[in-house]
């Protein structure tokens, strides 16, 4: 079974890669990373930084998660990310996404031992 840490990596990590100016990046990646099976995941963020740098966020600035839990952390520096948002007209099984590249601080929820990211909460 996929662990929460592995699920985070599958859904959110795309190290050393960037969409460049490929408008189909999200369509390809959401499918490749199995987020269009059974339904279209409406919103997802990919982080284009090393796994080490993203894991390190778990020891950075402690902030409140959207759901009120206290195990979220905000990155000290901005990171290169891509937001994928399902387009209004797309319907399962033909999931279609808009690709937006951003430089933002990421907020992740961490748990376990070792203490690692298990949920992407937000970007600011």
UniProtKB/Swiss-Prot annotation:
Disulfide bonds join 26-84, 40-95, 58-110, 65-72. Pancreas. Residues 14-23 have a biased composition (Polar residues). It holds the Pfam family RnaseA. Keywords: Disulfide bond, Endonuclease, Glycoprotein, Hydrolase, Lyase, Nuclease, Secreted. It is found in: Secreted. One of its GO terms (cellular component) is extracellular region. It catalyses: an [RNA] containing cytidine + H2O = an [RNA]-3'-cytidine-3'-phosphate + a 5'-hydroxy-ribonucleotide-3'-[RNA]; an [RNA] containing uridine + H2O = an [RNA]-3'-uridine-3'-phosphate + a 5'-hydroxy-ribonucleotide-3'-[RNA]. Residues 1-23 are annotated as: Disordered. This is Ribonuclease pancreatic. It comes from Balaenoptera acutorostrata (Common minke whale). The lineage of its organism: Eukaryota, Metazoa, Chordata, Craniata, Vertebrata.
């Amino acid at each position: 079974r996929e662990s929460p840490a592995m699920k985070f990596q599958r859904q959110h990590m795309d190290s050393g890669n960037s969409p460049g100016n490929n408008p189909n990046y999200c369509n390809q990646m959401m499918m490749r990373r199995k987020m269009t099976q059974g339904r279209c995941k409406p919103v997802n963020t990919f982080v284009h930084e090393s796994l080490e740098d993203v894991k390190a966020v778990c020891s950075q600035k402690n902030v409140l998660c959207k759901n009120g839990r206290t195990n979220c952390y905000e990155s000290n520096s901005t990171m290169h990310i891509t937001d994928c948002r399902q387009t209004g007209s797309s319907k399962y099984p033909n999931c279609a996404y808009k690709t937006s590249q951003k430089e933002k601080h990421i907020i992740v929820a961490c748990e376990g031992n070792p203490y690692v990211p298990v949920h992407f909460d937000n970007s600011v």
